[in-house]
Structure formats: structure tokens, C-alpha cells
Amino acid sequence: MTKKVAVGLSGGVDSALSAYLLQKQGYDVVGLTMATWDGSVNMPAVEGREGCYGPSEDKNIEDAKLVADRLGIPHYVVPVAGEYKTKVLDYFRAEYRAGRTPNPCVRCNQSIKFGALHLAARKMGIEFDYFATGHYARLDFKNENEPFLYRALDTGKDQTYFLSRLSAEQLSTVLFPLGGMHKDDVKALAAEIGWNDFAEKRESQDFIECGDYSVLFEESDQVPGDFVDVSGKVLGKHKGIVNYTVGQRKGLNIGGQKEPLYVVAIDAAKNQVILGPRSALSCIQVSAVDLNLMVSENSPLLAGPLDAHIRLGHKGSPAKILDLEPGRIRVEFETPQFAAAPGQVLVLYAGDGVVASAIIDK
């Protein structure tokens, strides 16, 4: 019996080609597009920008439907705006209000794209054996001592960081058709089959379309407070802690200093933003919570060598695990790292495989 695959169609080239390739492989393919925009945020449409959440969602839905029409497959728009607000937007706001720096795309994958979307689709009567997306990542389930999520062949486009909070159960029925391809080859294939409109489409640049996170917050969040140095000396006034993140240098507007100042920490309880020199952001260890262990706790891979990433785009650092207990991990880097921000995701790799992820605490 032919297996049915639901492909998450975003309206972009990667998900479009994933659906095309799976159909060529003989799967019974249906398209799902999640609808997250409900107009509750006062966000301007910005021409030339693409984002996952914003007023141009209708255009992306139209593009997803165009893919489905070209392939002759059913297409369903699945409303998940309520879940998106609760699990992603409210979480994002709460983290910034607490002085932390969340990654909303990681959260969306964990809670919505590989969670609420599936449940909502099945409630609509849409049944499927597998779920596929256009993510650049690979899966290989061997045994509990080995990773099951691996970096993509195209390391420049690898998206395992975004997927690192997913469980084995969530990924057990997932397909990533592009994991063994390079992005240039995906675009070339799109052009080859006459889908130049998708090959040339601009990629999503941020989780919100306009790129300005301030639109997600209320006026009551913009509470001025003190900029202080590491000794507690007041240096000036900030515009509200939700406007700052650890490691930030631009937009501080503090003059008369011997060297550039950075955001070193944020004290939400005191409504203070602590500033200091770049050297004050150097750290050799991090502790992280909400541990997602992607191998058995007895796996020899945890003994190292490990490659630690403390944010998206971080080049990584050799590291070792100092402490590992239920829900918590402490890691030491081989060399000091810059600006490990609380709230960001720590991802540990053994070779190309993801062995663990957690939320940086301190």
C-alpha cells in the first residue's frame, strides 16, 4: 500500500521541491500549510522581506497552493494561530521580559510545525503516515547510543540547530528529502522543471516579516531603567529591557567610555541592563536547563569529543560535559566563548550527529 506523506508547504522552493521529490519517489503526497497570522499584531507589510509570521501570509499560502496545483495533490490550510500565539509569541515575550534571549524558530519547530500542526490536521480528518519538510538535515535511526539527527550534506545550509529540541518520537515519522542535497542543486532542479518562480523567490529572513521585534511588545513593556556598569555605577538610561540582549553593542548610546561597552547581563527584577567591556562576556562554562538528550545517557559519545554551539551562526567550539543530570547539563569549552546568552539554545554535536540540546541558563 502506498504510504501517504504530508509535506509542510511554506510557499518556498525548499518545501516545493521536497513535495516534488517525494511524489517522484512514489509517495501519495498532500500539502499542509499552517496559518499563524491573525492580524492581532500591528505589523506593517515590508516589500521585499519574507518572514514566517506577518501580513503577507496570504501570498505564501497562494504560492503553496500553486505548488500543489502543479503536482496535482490536495492542499490544506491548517489554522494554528491560537497555538502559535501561546507557544511562540507569548513565550518570546515572556523570555525577553525576563531578560533572556529566546530563539522563536526553534520553539516553533518544537511546538507548532512538528506538534500542533499535526494535531490540527488530523482533527480536520487529514491522515498521513509521514510528515516532511524542506529542512536541510538528515535522519538515521540506528540504536539508542547513536544520534538520529545529523547535519545536512550542505553544511552551509544545515538546519539541525533549529531542529535540536525535537524528540525521537517527533522525528520518527519525519522525512527530510533535501538533507542529502546542496541548495544550489535544489534551485537548479527547480529551474530544470520550469519552476523558476520558486527558484528565484527570496528566502525567509526572520521569524517576523517586518524584522522589528518591538511590534510584538506593549507600550507597558517599554519601561525605562538604568544602564549600570559591572560595579553597579549608573551610566545612563535604557528604553526598556525588552530592547536589549546579552552581547549587544549597538544602540546603547553611552558615550565618554575608554572602550566600547556591551550588554553583559540583564537584571529584570531591578529593571537594569548591565554593561561592560567585551572581555566581560568571555565565558569558559555554561549551565543549561530543559535538557533534550538525543542519545542514551550511557552513550560513549557523550564522553567526547563534542562540538558546542551556543547560538545560531556560532562557529562552534570543542567542549566537554562536566555535569549531566536529569533536565540539566554543564559544559566547559576548550577556549573561552563570547556572549553565551541566557535563553539561547546550546546544541552539542558528536561529529555530524546531534547528541543533546538545552536552554542556556547561566
Indicate residue ranges for each PLM-predicted region.
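ATP-dependent adenylation/nucleotidyltransferase module used to activate substrates
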Residues: M1-S164, A191
